[in-house]
Amino acid sequence: MNKVVLLCRPGFEKECAAEITDKAGQREIFGFARVKENAGYVIYECYQPDDGDKLIRELPFSSLIFARQWFVVGELLQHLPPEDRITPIVGMLQGVVEKGGELRVEVADTNESKELLKFCRKFTVPLRAALRDAGVLANYETPKRPVVHVFFIAPGCCYTGYSYSNNNSPFYMGIPRLKFPADAPSRSTLKLEEAFHVFIPADEWDERLANGMWAVDLGACPGGWTYQLVKRNMWVYSVDNGPMAQSLMDTGQVTWLREDGFKFRPTRSNISWMVCDMVEKPAKVAALMAQWLVNGWCRETIFNLKLPMKKRYEEVSHNLAYIQAQLDEHGINAQIQARQLYHDREEVTVHVRRIWAAVGGRRDER
Protein backbone atom coordinates (compact mmCIF):
# COMPACT_ATOMS: atom_id res chain seq x y z
CA MET A 1 0.00 0.00 0.00
CA ASN A 2 1.77 3.09 -1.23
CA LYS A 3 -0.92 5.80 -1.02
CA VAL A 4 -1.70 8.06 1.93
CA VAL A 5 -4.99 9.96 2.07
CA LEU A 6 -4.87 13.27 3.95
CA LEU A 7 -8.14 15.00 4.84
CA CYS A 8 -8.00 18.80 4.89
CA ARG A 9 -10.15 21.93 4.77
CA PRO A 10 -11.66 22.36 1.27
CA GLY A 11 -9.68 25.02 -0.58
CA PHE A 12 -6.40 24.14 1.17
CA GLU A 13 -5.48 21.06 -0.87
CA LYS A 14 -2.40 22.76 -2.39
CA GLU A 15 -1.07 23.68 1.04
CA CYS A 16 -1.69 20.17 2.35
CA ALA A 17 0.06 18.69 -0.71
CA ALA A 18 3.04 21.05 -0.43
CA GLU A 19 3.44 20.20 3.23
CA ILE A 20 3.29 16.40 2.93
CA THR A 21 5.63 16.46 -0.10
CA ASP A 22 8.10 18.57 1.87
CA LYS A 23 7.97 16.60 5.13
CA ALA A 24 7.91 13.16 3.48
CA GLY A 25 10.89 14.21 1.35
CA GLN A 26 12.81 15.23 4.48
CA ARG A 27 12.48 11.59 5.60
CA GLU A 28 13.45 10.32 2.15
CA ILE A 29 9.97 8.99 1.49
CA PHE A 30 9.54 10.26 -2.03
CA GLY A 31 6.38 10.45 -4.09
CA PHE A 32 3.89 12.91 -5.56
CA ALA A 33 0.59 14.43 -4.45
CA ARG A 34 -2.67 14.09 -6.37
CA VAL A 35 -4.69 17.26 -5.85
CA LYS A 36 -8.24 18.10 -6.83
CA GLU A 37 -9.38 21.63 -6.00
CA ASN A 38 -11.95 21.92 -3.19
CA ALA A 39 -12.09 18.13 -2.81
CA GLY A 40 -11.24 18.28 0.91
CA TYR A 41 -8.52 15.65 0.61
CA VAL A 42 -5.13 14.95 -0.98
CA ILE A 43 -3.57 11.63 -1.99
CA TYR A 44 0.19 11.31 -1.57
CA GLU A 45 1.42 8.44 -3.73
CA CYS A 46 4.80 7.02 -2.68
CA TYR A 47 7.20 5.62 -5.27
CA GLN A 48 8.11 2.60 -3.12
CA PRO A 49 5.42 -0.04 -2.38
CA ASP A 50 5.65 -0.04 1.45
CA ASP A 51 6.42 3.63 1.96
CA GLY A 52 2.80 4.55 2.71
CA ASP A 53 2.93 2.52 5.92
CA LYS A 54 6.41 3.83 6.68
CA LEU A 55 5.21 7.43 6.31
CA ILE A 56 2.24 7.16 8.70
CA ARG A 57 4.43 5.32 11.23
CA GLU A 58 7.52 7.54 11.17
CA LEU A 59 6.30 11.09 10.49
CA PRO A 60 4.56 12.45 13.61
CA PHE A 61 0.98 13.36 12.70
CA SER A 62 1.22 16.21 15.22
CA SER A 63 3.86 17.84 12.99
CA LEU A 64 1.35 18.37 10.16
CA ILE A 65 -0.40 21.74 9.90
CA PHE A 66 -2.96 21.36 7.13
CA ALA A 67 -4.00 17.69 7.51
CA ARG A 68 -6.98 16.86 9.73
CA GLN A 69 -6.51 13.11 9.42
CA TRP A 70 -4.44 10.62 7.45
CA PHE A 71 -4.42 6.91 6.64
CA VAL A 72 -2.68 4.56 4.22
CA VAL A 73 -4.85 2.99 1.49
CA GLY A 74 -4.73 0.55 -1.42
CA GLU A 75 -6.28 0.92 -4.86
CA LEU A 76 -9.62 2.65 -5.34
CA LEU A 77 -12.64 0.35 -5.13
CA GLN A 78 -15.12 1.37 -7.85
CA HIS A 79 -18.62 0.32 -8.91
CA LEU A 80 -19.49 -1.40 -5.65
CA PRO A 81 -22.69 -3.39 -6.31
CA PRO A 82 -25.63 -1.80 -4.42
CA GLU A 83 -26.88 -5.25 -3.41
CA ASP A 84 -23.54 -6.14 -1.73
CA ARG A 85 -21.04 -3.37 -1.03
CA ILE A 86 -19.63 -5.17 2.00
CA THR A 87 -17.94 -8.21 0.42
CA PRO A 88 -15.46 -6.28 -1.82
CA ILE A 89 -14.52 -3.99 1.10
CA VAL A 90 -13.89 -6.93 3.43
CA GLY A 91 -11.84 -8.59 0.68
CA MET A 92 -9.64 -5.50 0.29
CA LEU A 93 -8.92 -5.35 4.02
CA GLN A 94 -8.30 -9.03 4.72
CA GLY A 95 -4.59 -9.69 5.04
CA VAL A 96 -3.96 -5.94 5.41
CA VAL A 97 -5.35 -5.32 8.91
CA GLU A 98 -5.82 -7.89 11.65
CA LYS A 99 -7.87 -7.24 14.81
CA GLY A 100 -8.29 -3.51 14.18
CA GLY A 101 -9.47 -1.49 17.16
CA GLU A 102 -12.06 0.77 15.50
CA LEU A 103 -13.90 1.35 12.21
CA ARG A 104 -14.43 4.78 10.68
CA VAL A 105 -16.49 5.08 7.48
CA GLU A 106 -15.81 8.64 6.34
CA VAL A 107 -16.11 11.24 3.58
CA ALA A 108 -14.41 14.54 2.82
CA ASP A 109 -15.80 17.62 4.58
CA THR A 110 -17.61 19.13 1.56
CA ASN A 111 -21.20 20.15 0.85
CA GLU A 112 -21.36 17.52 -1.90
CA SER A 113 -20.52 14.76 0.59
CA LYS A 114 -23.29 15.50 3.10
CA GLU A 115 -25.75 13.02 1.57
CA LEU A 116 -22.98 10.44 1.33
CA LEU A 117 -22.21 10.99 5.02
CA LYS A 118 -25.74 9.88 5.95
CA PHE A 119 -25.16 6.65 4.04
CA CYS A 120 -21.79 6.13 5.75
CA ARG A 121 -23.35 6.31 9.20
CA LYS A 122 -25.98 3.70 8.30
CA PHE A 123 -23.45 1.52 6.50
CA THR A 124 -21.03 1.43 9.45
CA VAL A 125 -23.07 -1.01 11.58
CA PRO A 126 -23.38 -3.91 9.08
CA LEU A 127 -19.83 -3.35 7.80
CA ARG A 128 -18.44 -3.46 11.34
CA ALA A 129 -20.16 -6.80 11.97
CA ALA A 130 -18.78 -8.28 8.73
CA LEU A 131 -15.24 -7.04 9.46
CA ARG A 132 -15.39 -8.59 12.94
CA ASP A 133 -16.52 -11.91 11.47
CA ALA A 134 -13.58 -11.76 9.03
CA GLY A 135 -11.05 -10.97 11.78
CA VAL A 136 -10.24 -7.54 10.31
CA LEU A 137 -11.72 -5.90 13.43
CA ALA A 138 -11.39 -7.09 17.01
CA ASN A 139 -14.63 -8.06 18.75
CA TYR A 140 -14.40 -4.98 20.96
CA GLU A 141 -13.17 -1.46 20.26
CA THR A 142 -9.69 -0.83 21.62
CA PRO A 143 -7.43 2.24 21.28
CA LYS A 144 -4.34 0.02 21.23
CA ARG A 145 -4.94 -1.40 17.74
CA PRO A 146 -4.93 0.26 14.27
CA VAL A 147 -8.00 2.20 13.11
CA VAL A 148 -9.68 0.80 9.97
CA HIS A 149 -10.73 3.52 7.51
CA VAL A 150 -13.24 3.23 4.66
CA PHE A 151 -13.22 6.53 2.77
CA PHE A 152 -16.02 7.16 0.25
CA ILE A 153 -15.29 9.73 -2.45
CA ALA A 154 -18.55 9.04 -4.36
CA PRO A 155 -21.48 6.61 -4.11
CA GLY A 156 -20.15 3.08 -4.65
CA CYS A 157 -16.56 4.34 -4.76
CA CYS A 158 -14.14 4.14 -1.81
CA TYR A 159 -10.61 3.69 -0.54
CA THR A 160 -9.88 1.24 2.28
CA GLY A 161 -6.95 1.33 4.66
CA TYR A 162 -5.78 2.04 8.18
CA SER A 163 -4.03 4.46 10.50
CA TYR A 164 -2.14 3.94 13.76
CA SER A 165 -4.04 5.00 16.87
CA ASN A 166 -0.89 6.51 18.41
CA ASN A 167 -0.18 8.66 15.34
CA ASN A 168 -3.48 9.94 13.95
CA SER A 169 -6.37 12.21 14.89
CA PRO A 170 -8.61 10.58 17.50
CA PHE A 171 -11.64 12.31 15.96
CA TYR A 172 -14.00 11.02 13.26
CA MET A 173 -13.00 12.76 9.98
CA GLY A 174 -10.41 14.58 12.09
CA ILE A 175 -13.08 16.95 13.41
CA PRO A 176 -13.85 17.39 17.13
CA ARG A 177 -17.63 17.65 17.63
CA LEU A 178 -18.07 20.77 19.77
CA LYS A 179 -21.28 22.53 20.73
CA PHE A 180 -21.43 26.33 20.72
CA PRO A 181 -22.15 27.49 24.30
CA ALA A 182 -25.26 29.69 24.35
CA ASP A 183 -23.68 32.16 26.80
CA ALA A 184 -20.40 32.63 24.87
CA PRO A 185 -19.85 36.17 23.47
CA SER A 186 -18.76 34.98 20.00
CA ARG A 187 -18.34 31.84 17.90
CA SER A 188 -14.56 32.30 18.02
CA THR A 189 -14.72 30.59 21.41
CA LEU A 190 -14.86 27.25 19.56
CA LYS A 191 -11.40 27.86 18.06
CA LEU A 192 -9.76 27.92 21.48
CA GLU A 193 -11.80 25.00 22.78
CA GLU A 194 -10.81 22.93 19.74
CA ALA A 195 -7.17 23.97 20.20
CA PHE A 196 -7.25 22.63 23.77
CA HIS A 197 -8.58 19.29 22.45
CA VAL A 198 -6.00 19.09 19.64
CA PHE A 199 -2.88 20.30 21.44
CA ILE A 200 -3.30 19.19 25.06
CA PRO A 201 -3.75 15.50 25.97
CA ALA A 202 -6.99 14.95 27.88
CA ASP A 203 -5.17 13.46 30.88
CA GLU A 204 -3.13 16.69 31.28
CA TRP A 205 -6.05 19.14 31.33
CA ASP A 206 -6.38 19.16 35.13
CA GLU A 207 -2.73 20.14 35.47
CA ARG A 208 -2.24 22.48 32.52
CA LEU A 209 -5.70 24.11 32.42
CA ALA A 210 -6.09 24.27 36.17
CA ASN A 211 -8.38 26.27 38.45
CA GLY A 212 -6.83 29.48 39.72
CA MET A 213 -4.26 29.94 36.95
CA TRP A 214 -3.52 33.42 35.65
CA ALA A 215 -3.99 34.07 31.93
CA VAL A 216 -3.77 36.93 29.42
CA ASP A 217 -5.99 37.33 26.34
CA LEU A 218 -4.51 39.78 23.81
CA GLY A 219 -7.08 41.33 21.46
CA ALA A 220 -9.83 39.91 23.64
CA CYS A 221 -12.97 41.85 22.57
CA PRO A 222 -15.75 40.73 22.88
CA GLY A 223 -14.40 37.78 24.86
CA GLY A 224 -14.80 34.53 22.93
CA TRP A 225 -11.38 33.25 24.00
CA THR A 226 -11.59 34.79 27.48
CA TYR A 227 -14.81 32.79 27.92
CA GLN A 228 -12.90 29.49 27.62
CA LEU A 229 -10.38 30.57 30.25
CA VAL A 230 -13.09 31.80 32.63
CA LYS A 231 -14.98 28.53 32.12
CA ARG A 232 -11.90 26.76 33.49
CA ASN A 233 -11.90 29.06 36.54
CA MET A 234 -8.81 31.05 35.57
CA TRP A 235 -8.14 34.69 36.40
CA VAL A 236 -7.86 36.60 33.13
CA TYR A 237 -6.37 39.91 32.01
CA SER A 238 -8.35 40.74 28.86
CA VAL A 239 -6.43 43.29 26.79
CA ASP A 240 -8.32 45.24 24.11
CA ASN A 241 -9.46 48.78 23.38
CA GLY A 242 -12.87 47.32 22.50
CA PRO A 243 -15.41 46.42 25.23
CA MET A 244 -15.77 43.00 26.84
CA ALA A 245 -19.07 41.15 27.19
CA GLN A 246 -20.77 42.16 30.45
CA SER A 247 -21.51 38.52 31.26
CA LEU A 248 -17.75 37.89 31.53
CA MET A 249 -17.12 41.00 33.62
CA ASP A 250 -19.86 39.90 36.02
CA THR A 251 -17.92 36.73 36.90
CA GLY A 252 -15.33 38.77 38.78
CA GLN A 253 -12.57 36.72 37.14
CA VAL A 254 -11.79 39.20 34.34
CA THR A 255 -9.72 42.37 34.49
CA TRP A 256 -10.31 44.46 31.36
CA LEU A 257 -7.27 46.51 30.30
CA ARG A 258 -8.00 49.09 27.60
CA GLU A 259 -4.66 48.81 25.84
CA ASP A 260 -3.16 47.79 22.50
CA GLY A 261 -2.28 44.09 22.67
CA PHE A 262 1.05 44.75 20.94
CA LYS A 263 2.10 47.31 23.57
CA PHE A 264 0.84 45.55 26.71
CA ARG A 265 3.50 44.25 29.11
CA PRO A 266 2.45 42.01 32.02
CA THR A 267 3.29 42.98 35.59
CA ARG A 268 2.70 39.52 37.09
CA SER A 269 5.42 36.86 36.94
CA ASN A 270 3.15 33.81 37.30
CA ILE A 271 1.10 33.91 34.08
CA SER A 272 0.48 30.37 32.86
CA TRP A 273 -1.37 31.11 29.61
CA MET A 274 -1.36 33.82 26.98
CA VAL A 275 -3.85 33.53 24.12
CA CYS A 276 -4.15 35.80 21.11
CA ASP A 277 -6.51 36.05 18.13
CA MET A 278 -5.68 39.42 16.58
CA VAL A 279 -6.24 40.33 12.92
CA GLU A 280 -2.70 41.36 11.97
CA LYS A 281 0.11 40.33 9.64
CA PRO A 282 1.42 36.91 10.70
CA ALA A 283 5.04 38.10 10.93
CA LYS A 284 4.06 40.81 13.41
CA VAL A 285 2.09 38.36 15.56
CA ALA A 286 4.94 35.82 15.45
CA ALA A 287 7.41 38.47 16.64
CA LEU A 288 5.13 39.38 19.56
CA MET A 289 4.66 35.73 20.53
CA ALA A 290 8.42 35.13 20.43
CA GLN A 291 8.93 38.14 22.70
CA TRP A 292 6.49 36.77 25.28
CA LEU A 293 8.10 33.34 25.24
CA VAL A 294 11.71 34.55 25.31
CA ASN A 295 10.98 36.88 28.23
CA GLY A 296 9.17 34.15 30.15
CA TRP A 297 6.00 36.23 30.40
CA CYS A 298 3.89 33.08 29.94
CA ARG A 299 4.39 29.32 30.20
CA GLU A 300 2.13 28.32 27.30
CA THR A 301 0.49 30.20 24.47
CA ILE A 302 -2.12 29.54 21.81
CA PHE A 303 -2.42 32.09 19.01
CA ASN A 304 -3.70 32.45 15.46
CA LEU A 305 -1.70 33.39 12.38
CA LYS A 306 -3.82 34.89 9.61
CA LEU A 307 -2.84 33.50 6.21
CA PRO A 308 -2.01 35.44 3.03
CA MET A 309 -3.75 34.62 -0.26
CA LYS A 310 -0.67 32.90 -1.76
CA LYS A 311 2.22 30.75 -0.51
CA ARG A 312 0.37 30.02 2.71
CA TYR A 313 2.40 26.96 3.71
CA GLU A 314 5.64 28.85 3.09
CA GLU A 315 4.43 31.82 5.17
CA VAL A 316 3.44 29.66 8.14
CA SER A 317 6.69 27.67 7.94
CA HIS A 318 8.70 30.90 7.89
CA ASN A 319 6.92 32.29 10.96
CA LEU A 320 7.26 29.07 12.94
CA ALA A 321 10.96 28.88 12.01
CA TYR A 322 11.40 32.47 13.25
CA ILE A 323 9.86 31.63 16.63
CA GLN A 324 11.99 28.47 16.90
CA ALA A 325 15.16 30.44 16.06
CA GLN A 326 14.39 33.05 18.74
CA LEU A 327 13.84 30.34 21.34
CA ASP A 328 17.03 28.51 20.33
CA GLU A 329 19.05 31.73 20.47
CA HIS A 330 17.97 32.30 24.07
CA GLY A 331 18.49 28.71 25.22
CA ILE A 332 14.80 27.91 25.63
CA ASN A 333 13.51 24.39 25.03
CA ALA A 334 9.93 24.53 23.80
CA GLN A 335 7.34 22.40 22.06
CA ILE A 336 5.74 24.00 18.97
CA GLN A 337 2.66 22.65 17.21
CA ALA A 338 0.45 24.22 14.55
CA ARG A 339 -2.80 23.10 12.95
CA GLN A 340 -5.47 24.52 10.73
CA LEU A 341 -8.40 23.68 12.98
CA TYR A 342 -11.91 22.86 11.83
CA HIS A 343 -13.12 26.19 13.26
CA ASP A 344 -10.28 28.14 11.61
CA ARG A 345 -10.82 29.79 8.25
CA GLU A 346 -7.98 31.66 6.50
CA GLU A 347 -5.69 31.05 9.47
CA VAL A 348 -3.78 28.45 11.46
CA THR A 349 -3.62 28.01 15.22
CA VAL A 350 -0.26 27.62 16.95
CA HIS A 351 0.54 26.21 20.39
CA VAL A 352 3.91 26.78 22.07
CA ARG A 353 4.88 25.40 25.47
CA ARG A 354 8.05 26.40 27.29
CA ILE A 355 9.64 23.25 28.74
CA TRP A 356 12.77 24.71 30.32
CA ALA A 357 15.33 27.47 29.83
CA ALA A 358 19.13 27.28 30.01
CA VAL A 359 19.17 30.69 31.68
CA GLY A 360 17.08 31.21 34.83
CA GLY A 361 13.78 32.76 33.79
CA ARG A 362 10.41 31.71 35.13
CA ARG A 363 10.35 30.37 38.70
CA ASP A 364 8.44 27.27 37.59
CA GLU A 365 11.30 26.27 35.25
CA ARG A 366 14.11 26.43 37.81
Curated annotation (Swiss-Prot):
Enzyme kind, highest EC tier: transferase
Positions annotated as active site in the UniProt record: K306
Keywords, alphabetical: Cytoplasm, Methyltransferase, rRNA processing, S-adenosyl-L-methionine, Transferase
InterPro entries tied to this protein: RlmM_FDX (IPR040739), RlmM_THUMP-like (IPR048646), RNA_MeTrfase_FtsJ_dom (IPR002877), rRNA_MeTrfase_M (IPR011224), SAM-dependent_MTases_sf (IPR029063)
BP terms from Gene Ontology: rRNA processing
Residues noted as binding S-adenosyl-L-methionine in the record, renumbered to the chain: S188, C221, P222, G223, G224, D240, D260, D277
EC number: 2.1.1.186
Catalysis: reaction(s): cytidine(2498) in 23S rRNA + S-adenosyl-L-methionine = 2'-O-methylcytidine(2498) in 23S rRNA + S-adenosyl-L-homocysteine + H(+)
A GO CC term assigned to this protein in UniProt: cytoplasm
GO-annotated molecular function: rRNA (cytosine-2'-O-)-methyltransferase activity
Assembly: Monomer.
Domain free text: Consists of two structural domains: an N-terminal THUMP domain followed by a C-terminal catalytic Rossmann-like fold MTase domain in a novel arrangement. The two domains are connected by a long loop.
UniProt protein name: Ribosomal RNA large subunit methyltransferase M
Source organism per UniProt: Escherichia coli (strain K12)
